């Protein structure tokens, strides 16, 4: 498998499916444009985004937000279900995690 990139007008969303494509810290910082924030999903996948993206008023990332809201639903979580992702984001699939695990 190879990594999949989805480009939008507002931001980028990259899905990493292979360990050889997993970014290191510097690569992740460059992609998201600053300090990184990592969130582990219940299924073991890991999302990396810009920690200060909302403060920087980065544009909404619709693909990452849709994935977030499909995962963290109101019926299962007390908080975070209505949150959103801004700026570039990387989703590292569970089988591709090495450095970030």
Where are these regions (language model features)?
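Short beta-rich binding modules
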Residues: 1-101
